């Protein structure tokens, strides 16, 4: 589907049933509403008083139905860049990880800093915008829309495979960082302490499911193979 627009007939959606679909954007491509019901479609329409007032147009699908809901606030957020892809950008960063040590990869994975060489390069919610935070800006990846926050988690999973890190080890570190910050990560690395149980180890689904997708995708294609099959 991706960037192909599909008109949704009134019998399929219409003004009344439009509220029962998933992700809605306005004519500026800004996310206005997300309803979690298993429909990953992204629909565009005119909004008035937080309601869709005409027949929506399906412009694509999200990879995950809650892509445009901030896990921090529970609110819909973001903007969809229709037809724009980050496949090549994510693949390029993953290829870069082939020359990283684990320490270098960790340096590139912490929050991006524009004027510090390579710091946070893999934090694509900021690095993609050269320092401007774009956590919930949505772009195509594998033909589905993801946010840059999701993209960073997918990349992290891919990089873990490239670096030869078992998924459980990777996830324990991610959970420690999420739950305890840098000090939590240090505690985990020095004592083995974990901040939750298998398989999330203290992380949230917005990280876990996306990183698992990236990890499994990279396993399928080979740790150091840059010719990808979806």
Spans of features found by a protein language model:
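Glycine-rich short-loop/terminal segments
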Residues: 13-158, 162-175
């Amino acid at each position: 589907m991706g960037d192909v627009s599909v008109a949704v007939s009134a019998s399929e959606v219409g003004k009344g049933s439009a509220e029962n679909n998933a992700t809605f954007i306005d004519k500026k491509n800004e996310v206005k509403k997300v309803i979690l019901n298993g429909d990953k479609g992204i629909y565009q329409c005119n909004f008035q008083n937080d309601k869709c007032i005409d027949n929506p147009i399906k412009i694509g699908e999200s990879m995950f139905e809650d892509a445009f809901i901030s896990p921090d606030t529970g609110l819909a957020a973001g903007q969809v860049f229709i037809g724009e892809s980050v496949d090549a950008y994510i693949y390029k960063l993953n290829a870069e990880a082939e020359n990283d040590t684990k320490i270098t990869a960790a340096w590139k994975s912490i929050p991006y800093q524009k004027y510090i060489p390579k710091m946070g390069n893999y934090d694509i919610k900021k690095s993609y915008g050269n320092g401007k935070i774009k956590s919930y800006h949505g772009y195509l990846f594998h033909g589905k829309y993801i946010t840059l926050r999701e993209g960073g988690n997918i990349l992290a999973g891919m990089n873990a495979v490239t670096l030869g890190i078992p998924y459980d080890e990777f996830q324990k570190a991610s959970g420690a960082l999420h739950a305890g910050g840098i000090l939590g990560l240090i505690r985990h690395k020095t004592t083995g302490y974990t901040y939750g149980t298998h398989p999330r180890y203290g992380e949230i689904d917005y990280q876990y499911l996306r990183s698992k997708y990236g990890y499994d995708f990279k396993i399928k294609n080979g740790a150091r193979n840059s010719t990808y099959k979806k």
